[in-house]
């Protein structure tokens, strides 16, 4: 079951893939999700109908999701964030109890980050 995307998730997709959208698609997306304009406000500004705005937003969201399925940038980003959190925890533990095994654990986590790349 797919849960509806939050505004934050949509904005993250936009950050990763906005260059793959047309200028008009970028403008409509930004006006709605970042500037919080209504469909009617966007329609008036762009000289199109509110239904055309809704259709374009639906297409843009579909494209962003499609690009993410193909390229997987959000998953890679989330994995990197999780690894960074693990490194911070390991560093905190190492500060409390310095040991060679702690250094080894951090080195392994850093190598994992480097091998996964983004």
Show which residues each predicted segment covers.
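Short amphipathic alpha helix immediately N-terminal
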Residues: 23-34
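Hydrophobic positions on the alpha-helical face of helix-turn-helix-like DNA-binding modules
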Residues: 29, 42-43, 53
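Residues within the DNA-recognition helix of helix-turn-helix
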Residues: 56-59
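Intrinsically disordered, low-complexity basic tails/linkers immediately adjacent to helix-turn-helix/homeobox/MYB/SANT
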Residues: 71-99
